[in-house]
């Protein structure tokens, strides 16, 4: 344990010092400090006057309290003086109130006006919002009025039905949190909690009565202005009906009822008769169902379907169809069934084991060649390629497959295959030297690709004995150069042309400047590479060799006559080195402009500097 403490003493010591700081007794320290203050004696005037710290502190505290009291007393005196001055001025001023008690300083604009109270005569008894019954009997218990449904707070479940969300998806409020969604709008723009007074059905009866009067007088779709005014005077402000939003028939025009409010659409007067009788009976039936509050549901407006117009126009077969339009249903018709001919369905993958039929479809190339050229016109030039535009894609596909098969056959057969083919061709030429008509499946080209037509059918002319020899399968390829088709030759030429033209297409302003710089700096750099290496001592020896004796003067221009510019620079550096070694002396004419190109050299010694240092002895050593 002691070993561990001795090893980690430098780590434990700060912790011990920190614990000692918490063991300090503050009271004891203060007591010791006070004792030291009592023992300390500070005297002035040779010991006559002594100083005590406690007395000095009390003296300072007392002087501060006295000073603060003096400041407060001075503050109160200042305010008393100000009050006295203001009261004195007020007493000296004459009073503005006269003997009659009228104040001259005050002005009254409506002094002589009589007091008028708010008149209540303009309130119409018909337009009151309070309905009182004459036979009303006071009950002992007061009935608490029901809270309007518009003021009843909705439940949380109802709020979740139609929430109002922000752009971030946060739920801000609900539809029923706004009064405009729970109250009834008034024509004046206010939102009413509940309808009071007449119901919307009474307004409908009044309009119907006006229509009956207008029918008896022979007027249609019009109401006299007097009756209209009477109707407006009879209506209550709170009983004005609200316009009904029509969602049943949006495209139908608005019906004019003579009032201009558009509360309920009514039928035209021209259609009076059985319809009006039925409507009147329906209204009478609905009257029986009115409750005590006087509210009934309005009749649902019958949806009028527009009669479709008969189209006599001929349909346009090229017109673009509407994807959302309901198409005319057509009966299903059974189509014709076509069977695939034998040979086409053989390539289809099927798990059923079927017997292969011996009959197959005719080869397309044979059929196409026989159709395109029947062999009777052997001497005439034939057209290049197929004559049918629909067969062109299939034709070129078959040609590419044949060319690929020929290349593979050339690689496998090699030189022996070519020898056998040449022998067979020679035998055929000996048998029939005249030109025989070619096979039907042989296609000939008159274009540039006709160079490979001689070896086009090499695979078909190979005898069976050569094909079955196992030795021919081991022959190494690359004995013959593959015959190129016309398309590949064109493709190679185009690629070569593009590669050569890229350097012209990629030339920019920067590349032109770089090329000019290379053309300019290339010869100079090559010339500098051909220069010999610079040896300053060698050039110094050459410069001193041009002097015949010591002390002779020569201008630098005369020494550098017929020298190359780079040689002059090298000799200049060598002359400066010689002047530093005190081998030559450099001088020029005075003046800035006059001293140009007037450098002259005088030879001081023909011995080299390093040779002089070998035989040099210091003056201190030579004197000894």
Swiss-Prot record:
Disulfide bridge map: none
Localization in the cell: Nucleus
GO process annotations (BP): meiotic chromosome condensation; mitotic sister chromatid separation
InterPro entries registered for this protein in UniProt: CNDH2_C (IPR031737), H2_M (IPR031719), H2_N (IPR009378), Ncaph2 (IPR031739)
Biased composition (Acidic residues): 442-457
MF-aspect GO terms: chromatin binding
Record-linked Pfam families: CNDH2_C, CNDH2_M, CNDH2_N
The keyword Nucleus is assigned to this record: yes
Keyword annotations of the record: DNA condensation, Nucleus
Transmembrane parts of this sequence: none
Stretches for region Disordered: 429-457
A Gene Ontology cellular-component term: nucleus
Superkingdom: Eukaryota
Keyword Cell division: no
Function per UniProt: Regulatory subunit of the condensin-2 complex, a complex that seems to provide chromosomes with an additional level of organization and rigidity and in establishing mitotic chromosome architecture.
Family stated for the protein in its record: Belongs to the CND2 H2 (condensin-2 subunit 2) family.
Assembly, per entry: Component of the condensin-2 complex, which contains the smc2 and smc4 heterodimer, and three non SMC subunits, ncapg2, ncaph2 and ncapd3 that probably regulate the complex.
Protein name: Condensin-2 complex subunit H2
């Amino acid at each position: 344990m002691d070993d561990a403490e001795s090893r980690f003493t430098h780590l434990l010591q700060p912790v011990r010092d920190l614990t000692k700081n918490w063991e300090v007794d503050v009271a004891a320290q203060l007591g010791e400090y006070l004792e030291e203050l009592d023992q300390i004696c500070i005297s002035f005037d040779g010991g006559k006057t002594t100083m005590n710290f406690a007395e000095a502190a009390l003296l300072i505290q007392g002087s501060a309290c006295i000073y603060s009291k003096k400041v407060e007393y001075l503050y109160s005196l200042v305010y008393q003086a100000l009050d006295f001055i203001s009261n004195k001025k007020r007493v000296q001023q004459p009073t503005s109130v006269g003997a009659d008690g009228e104040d001259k300083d005050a002005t009254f604009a409506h002094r002589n006006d009589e007091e008028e109270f708010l008149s209540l005569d303009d309130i119409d008894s018909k337009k009151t919002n309070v309905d009182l019954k004459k036979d009303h009997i006071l009950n002992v218990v007061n009935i608490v009025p029901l809270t309007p449904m518009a003021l009843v707070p909705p439940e949380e479940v109802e709020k979740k039905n139609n929430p109002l969300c922000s752009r971030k998806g946060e739920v801000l409020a609900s539809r029923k949190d706004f009064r405009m969604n729970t109250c009834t709008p008034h024509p004046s723009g206010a939102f009413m909690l509940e309808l009071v007074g007449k119901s919307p059905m009474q307004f409908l009866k009044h309009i119907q009565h006006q229509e009956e009067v207008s029918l008896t007088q022979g007027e249609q779709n019009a109401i006299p202005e007097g009756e209209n005014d009477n109707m407006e005077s009879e209506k209550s402000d709170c009983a004005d009906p609200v316009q009904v939003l029509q969602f049943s028939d949006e495209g139908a025009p608005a019906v004019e009822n003579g009032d201009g409010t558009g509360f309920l659409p009514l039928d035209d007067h021209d259609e009076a008769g059985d319809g009006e009788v039925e409507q009147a009976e329906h209204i009478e039936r609905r009257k029986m169902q009115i409750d005590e509050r006087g509210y009934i549901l309005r009749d649902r407006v019958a949806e009028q379907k527009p009669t479709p117009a008969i189209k006599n126009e001929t349909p346009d077969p090229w017109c673009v169809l509407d994807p959302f339009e309901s198409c005319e249903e057509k009966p299903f018709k059974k189509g014709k069934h076509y069977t695939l001919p034998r040979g086409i369905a053989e390539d289809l993958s099927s798990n059923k084991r079927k017997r292969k039929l011996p009959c197959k479809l005719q080869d397309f190339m044979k059929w196409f060649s026989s159709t395109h050229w029947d062999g009777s016109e052997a001497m005439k030039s034939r057209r290049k390629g197929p004559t049918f535009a629909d067969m062109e894609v299939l034709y070129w596909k078959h040609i590419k497959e044949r060319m690929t098969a020929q290349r593979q056959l050339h690689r496998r057969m090699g030189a022996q295959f070519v020898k056998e083919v040449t022998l067979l061709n020679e035998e055929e030429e000996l048998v029939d030297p005249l030109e025989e008509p070619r096979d039907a499946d042989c296609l000939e080209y008159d274009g540039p690709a006709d160079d490979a037509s001689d070896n086009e059918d090499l695979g078909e002319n190979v005898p069976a004995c050569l094909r079955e020899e196992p030795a021919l399968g081991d022959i190494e390829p690359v004995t013959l150069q593959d015959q190129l088709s016309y398309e590949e030759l064109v493709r190679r030429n185009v690629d070569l042309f593009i590669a050569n033209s890229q350097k012209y297409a990629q030339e920019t302003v920067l590349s032109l400047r770089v090329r000019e710089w290379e053309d300019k700096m290339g010869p100079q750099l090559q010339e500098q590479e051909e220069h010999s290496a610079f040896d300053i001592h060698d050039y110094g020896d050459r410069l001193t060799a041009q002097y015949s004796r010591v002390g002779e003067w020569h201008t630098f221009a005369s020494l550098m006559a017929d020298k190359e510019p780079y040689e002059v620079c090298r000799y200049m550096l060598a002359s400066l080195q010689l002047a530093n070694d005190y081998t030559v002396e450099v001088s020029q004419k005075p003046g800035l402009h006059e001293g140009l190109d007037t450098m002259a050299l005088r030879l001081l010694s023909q011995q080299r500097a390093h040779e002089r240092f070998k035989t040099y002895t210091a003056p201190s050593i030579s004197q000894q």
